[in-house]
């Protein structure tokens, strides 16, 4: 069944005006030329072409993804003629989306990560690092952390909350990932919550533990802030640290506690062999990393 929809005079006039504007449009003229089409093509496909021009015009003065007004963020409408001569619409990444994809390409090297999307954009050469490095205390921590990259031993970065420890370690992670190393960035308190939530899912736990054991580079962020039990200490952290120490795998830590304070944190009251278990954890942390203090005011 065919439908013949009759336009009003006003609608006919508007359509004719739109077609006239389309024929004069530089983008339409270029499209016709590239595809060896004549003006009749505009008349037959005016609706699609009009929407395409609106999309192209919206992108023309765009300042970036944060200002995108397209239906799908970062995607521009494109047109092509298929082998049968029919006009097809499709979406393609705009220049800003392509740039963002390039900036995030190293994300595929992360085996396990609690980093946000914007965290993957952190670069050790960012102005934020360079400005912060003007502060004497931050410069020392930044320099020692970056200097650890070619060495076997990582860094145990400790200090008060908000001094920029996690931010610096995320930059370190991105550096390794961009240099083709497998990386895991783990917020220890969040990790423990997730493992408790999936306590009965042995497959999930084993998969996560393997990521932590075997990533080329591991960052244990905010260690000591988790809800500490014998299970979290002896069944989660110790096997990971033991594996990485034995295989001399690059490991970093951030904490609000010094190593000495962390040792006290892991001594659980009224539990057998507490001192020995705590010492075993700290022995591995000391073997895997060098303590570096990041003091100063909060940078949040």
Which role fits each region the language model picked out?
Residues 119-148:
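N-terminal pre-Walker A segment at the start of P-loop NTPase domains
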Residues 1-51, 55-59:
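Intrinsically disordered, low-complexity N-terminal extensions of AAA+/P-loop NTPases
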Residues 174-185:
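Post-Walker A helix-loop "phosphate-sensing" segment adjacent to the P-loop in P-loop NTPases
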Residues 59-115:
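Interdomain "pre-motor" coupling segment immediately N-terminal to P-loop NTPase/helicase cores
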Residues 149-169:
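Walker A/P-loop nucleotide-binding motif
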Residues 185-191:
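A short hydrophobic beta-strand->loop->alpha-helix junction that borders the nucleotide-binding pocket
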Residues 196, 200-249:
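Conserved nucleotide-sensing/catalytic segment adjacent to the nucleotide-binding pocket
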